[in-house]
Structures are given as C-alpha cells and as structure tokens.
C-alpha cells in the first residue's frame, strides 16, 4: 500500500479546499500531515510536549482493532471445514480488507482528526448522516468490545473452571473491564506500548506451533469441505470471516494522535494487513493439517488443545495465556478508538462538549466511561449473538463509508490527498462493489432476531440526533465546535 502513495494534489485553484475554507490558524489539524497534537491542552502540557503514536505502536493497535491473532476463528472450520476456512482467509482480504484499508488510508490522511469516518460522512452527506455513522460505529465497537471479556474467560475456564459461570464469572468480567479501562485512561502512548508487547507474546506460540507441526502435516486434510451431514453453515462461516477481517477504519478515529499521519497511517495499515492475514492462515493450516479433523471441537479455545497435541502441555498453556493477553490488547485498542471517536464528535459539535474533555493524561475520560458502561451492559450476551449484531450494524456504517468515498472523489476531485488510491471515479465505484455485495450476502444470512435488534438500534440513532439538536436549542447541554478544526461546510 505504501507504493500507491501519490504526491499532494494542488487544490489551490479549487473553491472548496477540504483541509480548510477559512484562513488557517497555526493549530494542527488544519493542514494534512501536521504532527502536533490537539491545541486544547492545559498550560502545563503544551501541544509540542504530547507524545504522538509512531508506526510500530500503530501497527499493533490496528492489529488488535482488526484481529488480535487467530483466537475466535475456530468457528470458521466448525462451520465449513478446513478447505473453505483456508480459502476464506486468503480470498476474503481481497474482497473486503484491502479495499477498506485503502479507503481508510486515503480518507484518514485527508482528515487527520479524531472524528475519523464521522468527519468523512459529514462532509459528503451532511451532519445528520455523519451522526448516524458515528452512532452505529460507536455502538458496533462497544458491542465488539463486549466480546473480549467473554473470550478471555472462555480461554481460562479450562484451567480455572470456576470462571465458567455464575458469580465468579460476572465478577471476573467486571474486574477485567475496570482494570483495562483504567489503562486506557492512563494514556494512548501506554496503550500503544502495551499493544506491541501483548502482540509479540500472542503471536509467538503460533510461530512455534507452526514449526513443530511440520513433521505431522498431511496436506490432504486441507481439502475437506465439511463432514457434517447438514453441510456448510454459511451464516456462521461468513460472520466469523467478516468479524475477524473488518474494522480497518477504526484507526481513523485515532489519526489526530498519530505522528505524521500522511506517512505513518498508510504504512501501518500495510504492515498490519500482512500481520493479520498471516496470523490466521498459518494456525488454520497447522491445526487442520497436523491433527485429524473433528469439526465439532473447533470452537473458541480449541487452539490451546491443538497446541497440547502438537507441542505438549507447555505449548497449550502458552496459547491459553496468549489468548488471554490478546483479548486484553483488543479491548484496549477498541476502547481507545471508541472513546476518541466520541471526543472527535464532540469537537465537531455533534455531542455535548463534555465528551471533548481530556484527562491530565490527554485521554477522553468521559468517552472511556461511556464505552466501558456499554461493554458491561452487553457482556451478558452470547458470543455468536454479539458477533451477528455487531456485524450488521457495522455493515450499515460501511455502506455510508463507501458512498462517502465515491461522493468525495466526485465532489472534490482535486482536493489534497497525501495518500491517494490510483483509480478515478469509475475505479472507486468498481472497488466498492465487491465489499458492498458481500454486505448484502451477510445481511441475507442474518436471522430475524438479530436483524430486528440491529434495526431498533439504527432507529434509535435516527431519532437521537434530532433530540440532541433540541437539547442544544433549549440550552440544556452545551455544544460547541472546536476552533482549531477546519470548516467542513461550503
């Protein structure tokens, strides 16, 4: 992806320069690629003193926002067998992950502020639809984050059975959520370092397992489609692939905290894409090729059992520990993205300005509290229910993003794009067709219960925005647009 970078386009002759319409003051987010932080800081901590995220931490933050490793992909084998699981993790990135990552690189470098995709949609379709984008993306992110305490405990319960149900499980979810929320509160730079350390620890056991499995591999096992009498469970298969290979755009809500985003963001997305795809393909090849297939065993936590068979008890325990730490990393990355998105929306006047307040560690503490509360409320749902509901809401937001991408290409063809996908308007339309078709397929396989719940959530957003406008009009809560941000409206 880095090879696709293009020089900035000179848009001085075009009337609506997207970066700014009013004469730009010195503060940061006006010009694409400026590396200083948000000017709204306390006197004791000036903008230049704020540490920004560099390439390596950003790679692992993206890795955890999208993946976190092969934990949770087991259902793809259970649903469809080894062959379709392997093919899915090879082909699916070309249909979905690469287009989404490219769009994120282009749009994220155009608008290096924490509103991310909310800002993109607002410029293309207006503030009402910008708010809807923010609502469904935040809600799907919180739903997604509710999975990680569940997965964390699922991997530990084989070694600590008491965590399997009842009060101990509920208490463990609460303690874990509070502890990780506090780490988010302490600062994004700390979260970035933690993501790197956790990522290395989570990936290493699968590297070891892959090498140890070589003498036991039987390639013929990879060609099995499904041994189940009912055939392929397409709904579970597609939702598992989609959940494990989406959310590339989540990093856009952190671009205001990134050092030199015009260069750092595309590079980080490229490296993270490779890391994610390889972290799926090799464990699936290892697990299905080295051990006789029993599809019903391929559920959450099965990689630990595979590790015990291939390398011994020590490797199984290492994978269990890696799964636990991986879920911690995913929680941290997702909550960072969700909370900074709320901050970005507040800076744009879409939410009460209290959401724009930062702690002394420069973190959006109100957004963190809201996101953590949502995680606790939703954590009682089952894994598959959460995945299906989150996927459907995310699909709605992605449709808005694809429309926005094409519309901005048409509306502002000469605008400054520090990273530009080398296609024209027609190419941008064609690039969005395969993932849009995939969205339709996923929706078609969604059961009625999940569809109704997701539709209700969308309707809440449609009503919530006018209600907030009325609250602003009545003066019950204060809304304001940060002065350092560019004017998006013509």
Swiss-Prot record:
State the Gene Ontology BP annotations. cadaverine transport; polyamine transport; response to heat
Q: What domain of life does the native source organism fall in? A: Eukaryota
Polar residues bias spans? 1-21
Matching Gene3D superfamilies: Amino acid/polyamine transporter I (1.20.1740.10)
Q: What happens when the gene is disrupted?
A: No visible phenotype under normal growth conditions, but mutant plants show increased tolerance to paraquat.
For this UniProt entry, the molecular function terms from Gene Ontology, in alphabetical order, are: polyamine transmembrane transporter activity; symporter activity
Which sequence ranges are marked TM in the entry?
A: 53-73, 83-103, 116-136, 160-180, 188-208, 231-248, 273-293, 303-323, 363-383, 386-406, 425-445, 448-468
Q: Where in the cell is it found?
A: Cell membrane
UniProt xrefs under Pfam families: AA_permease_2 (PF13520)
| Region Disordered, residue ranges | 1-38
Record flagged with keyword Cell cycle:
no
Family, per entry: Belongs to the amino acid-polyamine-organocation (APC) superfamily. Polyamine:cation symporter (PHS) (TC 2.A.3.12) family.
Please share what else the UniProt entry notes about this protein.
Methyl viologen is the brand name of paraquat. Plants over-expressing RMV1 show hypersensitivity to paraquat.
PANTHER family found in the cross-reference section? POLYAMINE TRANSPORTER PUT1, POLYAMINE TRANSPORTER RMV1
Name of the molecule in the record: Polyamine transporter RMV1
Q: What is the lineage of its organism?
A: Eukaryota, Viridiplantae, Streptophyta, Embryophyta, Tracheophyta
């Amino acid at each position: 992806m880095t090879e696709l970078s293009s020089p900035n386009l000179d848009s001085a002759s075009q009337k609506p320069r997207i970066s700014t319409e009013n004469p730009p003051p010195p503060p940061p987010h006006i010009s694409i690629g400026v590396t200083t932080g948000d000017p709204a800081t306390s006197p004791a901590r000036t903008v230049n003193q704020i540490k920004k995220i560099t390439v390596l931490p950003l790679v692992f933050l993206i890795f955890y926002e999208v993946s976190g490793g092969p934990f949770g992909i087991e259902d793809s084998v259970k649903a469809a067998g080894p062959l379709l699981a392997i093919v899915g993790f090879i082909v699916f990135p070309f249909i979905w992950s690469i287009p989404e990552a490219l769009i994120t690189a282009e749009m994220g470098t155009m608008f290096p502020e924490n509103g991310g995709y909310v800002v993109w949609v607002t410029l293309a379709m207006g503030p009402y639809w910008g708010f809807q984008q923010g609502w469904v993306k935040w809600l799907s992110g919180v739903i997604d984050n509710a999975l990680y305490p569940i997965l964390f405990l699922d991997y530990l319960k084989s070694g600590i059975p008491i965590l399997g149900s009842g009060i101990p499980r509920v208490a463990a979810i609460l303690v874990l959520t509070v502890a990780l929320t506090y780490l988010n509160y302490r600062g994004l730079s700390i979260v970035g370092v933690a993501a790197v350390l956790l990522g290395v620890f989570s990936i290493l056991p699968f590297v070891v397992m892959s090498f140890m499995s070589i003498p036991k591999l039987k390639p013929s096992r990879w060609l099995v489609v499904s041994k189940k009498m009912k055939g392929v469970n397409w709904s579970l298969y597609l939702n598992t692939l989609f959940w494990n290979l989406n959310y590339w755009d989540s990093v856009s809500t952190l671009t205001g905290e990134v050092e030199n985003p015009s260069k750092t963001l595309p590079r980080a997305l490229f490296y993270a894409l490779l890391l994610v795809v390889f972290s799926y393909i090799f464990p699936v090849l290892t697990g299905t090729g080295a051990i006789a297939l029993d599809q019903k065993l391929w559920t959450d936590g099965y990689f630990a059992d595979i590790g015990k068979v291939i390398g011994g008890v020590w490797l199984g325990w290492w994978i269990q520990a890696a799964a636990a730490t991986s879920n911690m990393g995913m929680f941290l990355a997702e909550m960072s993205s969700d909370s900074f998105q709320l901050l970005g929306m507040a800076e744009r006047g879409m939410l009460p300005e209290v959401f724009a307040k930062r702690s002394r560690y420069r973190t959006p503490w109100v957004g963190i509290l809201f996101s953590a509360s949502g995680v606790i409320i939703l954590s009682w749902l089952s894994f598959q229910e959460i995945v299906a509901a989150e996927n459907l809401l995310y699909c709605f937001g992605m449709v808005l993003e694809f429309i926005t991408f094409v519309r901005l290409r048409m509306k502002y063809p000469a605008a400054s794009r520090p990273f530009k996908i080398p296609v024209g308007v027609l190419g941008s339309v064609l690039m969005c067709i395969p993932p849009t078709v995939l969205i339709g397929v996923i929706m078609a396989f969604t059961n009625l219960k999940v569809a109704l719940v997701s539709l209700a959530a969308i309707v809440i957003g449609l009503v919530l925005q006018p209600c907030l406008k009325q609250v602003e009009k009545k003066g019950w809560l204060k809304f304001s647009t940060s002065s350092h941000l560019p004017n998006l409206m013509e």
